[in-house]
Design a protein with these regions (language model features):
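Non-catalytic regulatory/interaction regions at protein termini and inter-domain linkers
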Residues: 1-54, 61, 100
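Regulatory sensory and allosteric helical modules in signal-transduction proteins
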Residues: 50-79, 84, 88-142
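Sensory modules in modular signal-transduction proteins
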Residues: 66-85, 200-242
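Short loop/turn motifs at secondary-structure junctions and domain boundaries
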Residues: 75-79, 146-152, 217-219, 272-273
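PAS-family sensory domains
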Residues: 93-126, 188, 222-276
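PAS-family sensory/regulatory modules and their coupling/dimerization elements
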Residues: 142-143, 151-156, 256-296
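Extended hydrophobic
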Residues: 142-176
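Amphipathic alpha-helical "output/dimerization" segments
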Residues: 179-193
């Protein structure tokens, strides 16, 4: 109620510093002051049909990793009457899970998948502020401009990729009576987990691209080339090496070298001692045939 009366005084003029809410929330109040009336509720704009499907496809990696993380969190929050949400960087709600009665109450306000948490439509809200401020935000009760949200508490934290770019946000919503002290920190933990997973996927994809480029170059050389991992499993063999050693280029991938070939003693010793070999003559045995090669 104190914030409600503060809002009314703000409409009439200005608020003394002692009566202002947190700076980010107060700045939002100032932006909303000339845009809306607190008592009038305006349902959020909602992306539907092909538009919403296109947004979800564009955010497929965020959704895939986010859904797994949020579902795991919900599994251990069965007694909590709250919702966990995934939003894109524009504030469009892509997916949510959690308490069904709470979800139905939120749907009555127009918050369904595709709804935009835009400050210009619904007033001060945590997801919009989290994206704008770039850090976790919580907006509770009468800190919301719209009176329809005064019974609600929302927390949100942006999700960042390894380049520091916002990829979306994670939000938690519940009735004001059901909020808990750890709600904001929970969204922070989930957002960081999802961000780390996005970064790992990105690094893996980049490594695979570089590896494919390397393999493409090796495919074109005249010499036979093989590569294996620390366990002795074949990771790569080009067409020239497969032909020389009488191996199937595709079927040999991922198999132990010892299953494919009888390695020369000199090569086995060099592998065991981690010693390089340069232009040495060795003989492989493959399919009961001896194959003389010059090895580096």
């Amino acid at each position: 109620m104190e914030n409600t009366s503060s809002w009314q005084r703000l409409i009439e003029g200005d608020l003394p510093p002692a009566q202002r809410p947190a700076p980010a929330i107060y700045a939002s109040w100032l932006r909303c002051r000339s845009l809306m009336q607190p008592a009038v509720w305006k349902a959020p704009h909602c992306a539907l049909g092909a538009t919403f499907n296109s947004i979800c496809q564009r955010k497929n990696d965020l959704l895939t990793l986010g859904q797994a993380a949020l579902e795991d969190a919900c599994e251990y929050m069965e007694q909590r009457r709250c919702l966990l949400m995934i939003l894109d960087e524009s504030g469009c709600m892509l997916w949510l899970c959690g308490d069904i009665p709470t979800r139905e109450c939120l749907q009555l306000l127009g918050f369904t998948p595709g709804a935009y948490w835009a400050e210009g439509d619904i007033g001060t809200n945590a997801p919009s502020l989290a994206v704008a401020e770039g850090h976790p935000m919580q907006v509770r009760g009468s800190e919301h401009v719209r009176q329809a949200l005064h019974d609600w508490s929302f927390c949100a934290t942006p999700v960042y990729d390894n380049s520091g770019r916002q990829r979306g946000s994670i939000a938690l919503g519940c009735r004001l009576a059901d909020c808990a002290a750890g709600d904001l920190s929970l969204t922070l933990a989930l957002a960081r987990e999802i961000g780390n997973s996005l970064n790992a996927d990105s690094l893996l994809a980049e490594s695979n691209r570089h590896l494919n480029q390397l393999y493409g170059l090796l495919d074109g050389v005249d010499d036979g080339v093989m590569a294996w991992d620390h366990r002795g499993y074949l990771q790569y063999i080009n067409q020239r090496a497969a032909s020389l050693l009488k191996l199937d280029e595709q079927q040999s991938q991922g198999k132990a070298l010892t299953q494919l070939l009888t390695l020369p003693a000199l090569l086995n010793r060099a592998i065991a001692q981690r010693q390089p070999l340069q232009h040495v003559e060795v003989t492989f045995e493959s399919q009961r045939q001896f194959i003389a090669t010059l090895l580096t």
